[in-house]
């Protein structure tokens, strides 16, 4: 189980410099109007971090809270496309450092007993890191 923690640490350390290497125009370019830009994908990862943070906090004291979000609405309403890239990256980094701290705390507890959205916290933590890596690959892929 600790493997995903190490993967998460590596992602947090590497992702900011990987993003900084992307040309500003390419980072904001939308392949088609209905699809997210790389910048908006970063915004989606911010929304995911915030939503998952609430899941992990609430599931420790509530019985199986149901916490969902509409990702397209969140992305549009947050106006990530017009936001400063550095501000988004700083927010992403702060949220994920806090999630990493929380994950390290949670792995000492019985994660198979606590649930959120009918899924164990153990599953949700590993899935969060896999989701982050999936979108990291999307962002880093050549357009």
Explain the meaning of each model-derived region:
Residues 1, 26, 41, 77, ...:
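Residue-level detector of alpha-helix boundaries and kinks
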Residues 1-4, 51-94, 143:
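Short, helix-capping/interhelical loops that line the mouth of catalytic, cofactor-
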Residues 14, 18-21, 25, 55, ...:
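Amphipathic, soluble alpha-helical interaction motifs
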Residues 28-71, 111-143:
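Short, contiguous alpha-helical
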Residues 1-2, 14-18, 29-33, 72-77, ...:
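Short amphipathic alpha-helical segments, especially helix-boundary/capping motifs
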Residues 7-11, 18, 76-112, 128:
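Acidic/histidine-rich alpha-helical segments that form the ligand environment
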Residues 1-24, 47-58, 130-133:
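Alpha-helical bundle segments that constitute or directly flank the non-heme di-iron/ferroxidase center
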């Amino acid at each position: 189980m600790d493997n995903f923690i190490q993967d998460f640490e590596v992602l947090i350390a590497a992702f900011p410099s990987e993003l900084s290497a992307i040309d500003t125009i390419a980072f904001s370019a939308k392949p088609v109007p209905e699809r997210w830009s790389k910048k908006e994908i970063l915004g989606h990862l911010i929304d995911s971090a915030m939503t998952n943070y609430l899941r992990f906090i609430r599931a420790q004291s509530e019985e199986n809270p149901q916490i969902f979000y509409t990702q397209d609405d969140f992305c549009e309403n947050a106006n990530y496309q017009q936001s400063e890239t550095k501000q988004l990256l700083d927010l992403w980094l702060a949220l994920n450092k806090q999630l990493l701290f929380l994950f390290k705390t949670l792995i000492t507890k019985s994660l198979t007993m606590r649930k959120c959205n009918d899924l164990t916290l153990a599953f949700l933590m590993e899935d969060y890191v896999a989701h982050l890596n999936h979108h990291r690959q999307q962002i880093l892929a050549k357009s």
